[in-house]
Amino acid sequence: MLFSRFVLLAFGSVAAVSASSIYARGRGGSSTDQPVANPYNTKEISLAAGLVQQTYCDSTENGLKIGDSELLYTMGEGYARQRVNIYHSPSLGIAVAIEGTNLFSLNSDLHDAKFWQEDPNERYIQYYPKGTKLMHGFQQAYNDLMDDIFTAVKKYKKEKNEKRVTVIGHSLGAAMGLLCAMDIELRMDGGLYKTYLFGLPRLGNPTFASFVDQKIGDKFHSIINGRDWVPTVPPRALGYQHPSDYVWIYPGNSTSAKLYPGQENVHGILTVAREFNFDDHQGIYFHTQIGAVMGECPAQVGAH
């Protein structure tokens, strides 16, 4: 029922957008480069997966240990606003982990369904190239938390004498995380250290995707598991485009993975049929489960 509600909301949004013709139809290119061996640090991916899994858990007491990381602060509760955990990690620095869709929250569901494109928020539009467009729902979800995230990150960077900031997200939280990672790179002293994004949906148009490549391409880590369908939405036909490079775990929930270079690589995830369930979206990412509300609480890094 919850999944059906999401699908109906999504298709209703597409119909409304199509009728009003308020989205961009520009379509970016597709990479034809062959995949290469996974160059990413899989231990860091495993840790990042645990840190974002914990955002789905109700245990939010400061001092909680997940992997090498200590939970410092939590904002949002997953209903009116997505939950965001702030950690300190010897591996990742100050780590910002953002929860994905809470299917028990209509507000959270609606963020996924608002497919139309809009300009970047007035707070950061000056940093983006002309013509940049972002999905309304994902940007709205991030803007609800933007000021609190910046305040907390600045506070804990100072308290922990830490220069590194890593942003992590899953699903809706991955889209929010990409926008947050760009915002930190563009507007915060010291910029971004890394970002790890799991099951990332498309966030913006080709202008945005290419600007991500330009600004944080060497810090950007997108991980897709198996036949996960979430990274295939919103559709490219609506003017959306992924930034370059993703690691594809295939078969799903295994440790077999390759990097697919460039934007929208033709040899990757679209070569296999999608499965419209959450078995791979909420799966095992290099020995750590991201199971959302049905996952392990507290999160267990490297337990699989």
Curated annotation (Swiss-Prot):
Temperature dependence is: Optimum temperature is 25 degrees Celsius.
Relate the outcome reported for changing N277F: Shows a clear preference for short- and medium-chain p-NP esters (C4 to C8). Decreases considerably specific activity
Q: Could you tell me the keywords of this UniProt record?
A: Cell wall, Disulfide bond, Glycoprotein, Hydrolase, Lipid degradation, Lipid metabolism, Metal-binding, Secreted, Signal, Virulence
Q: How is its activity regulated?
A: RHC 80267, a well-known inhibitor of diacylglycerol lipases from mammals, also acts as an inhibitor for LIP1/SMG1.
Q: What is the effect of changing W229L?
A: Shows a clear preference for short- and medium-chain p-NP esters (C4 to C8). Decreases considerably specific activity
Q: How is it used?
A: A novel method for upgrading high-acid rice bran oil (RBO) by efficiently reducing the amount of free fatty acids uses ethanol as a novel acyl acceptor in combination with the highly selective lipase LIP1/SMG1-F278N and enables an unprecedented deacidification efficiency of up to 99.80% in a short time (6 h).
Protein's recorded name: Secreted mono- and diacylglycerol lipase LIP1
Q: Which organism is it from?
A: Malassezia globosa (strain ATCC MYA-4612 / CBS 7966) (Dandruff-associated fungus)
GN (gene name): LIP1
